[in-house]
Amino acid sequence: LNPEAIRKKFPVVAGNEETLFFDNASTSQTPTPVIDCIRSFYESECSNVARASYSRATALSAKVESARVKVAEFLNADKDDIAFTGGATESLNMVAMSWGMHNLDDGDEIMICHEDHHSAVYPWLNLKETLSRFGKEIKLVDFDLHPSGVYDWQDIKNKLSSKTRLIALSHIHHLYGMEMDIAEIKAILPENVLVALDASQSAGHIKIDVQTLGADFVSFSGHKMYAANGVGILYSKKEVRETMWPARAGSKTAFKNDADELKLTSSRLASIIECGTLN
């Protein structure tokens, strides 16, 4: 690798030998091709996706769907399994609200690790509080992290119960940098316990094959892997997706208003999660 050639792709450090950016795990710098792409959009392609039949809009809609296919290939998933969001935080909140609000009953349990990133923990705390305000009480069960920075799978095993519905996991820990053995954890879980995986720190560094991982939900952001801010990905298995309901609604939500009763007409994840104008 030629470090200087790589630096030239990033305007913030190009030609400035004194600048070394060490916070890419939080937010990566934006390379020239991405900046050029954004500039091109605003200069010559700006239109609304999936809203119109004129050539500029249909061309842009085709680009969005092409990007969806590429993300699906990146994860070894089907394009119908992929939704674009505003980032990993939004993806994780969509899991909590679109799945959790419509599938959890009194006494059900969600397993979380309080040492995970707040964006992987707070959506479940918020879900618990929201359900409580509607008269439904769920329980959050905290499991331990080893001093080495990996999950204590024995503690997870000991705290599983017949009421456990989902476990929230990080693929690579945001503080300790340890890759979690998702397959090992998955092996001790009953088949009916779902896995919501935060892949924010792994997507840009290691191969993610959702078929091998077996996670039911996978979330990550673009801003940690050289994309623009405000871009995120949510993956969901088809069979889980069919139990979800939109947490937000608007244009592009696959609703049919049948005698004042809303019905979903598609289980495509984008039809459930994406609404309004995309970033």
Where are these regions (language model features)?
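Pyridoxal 5′-phosphate
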Residues: L1-N279
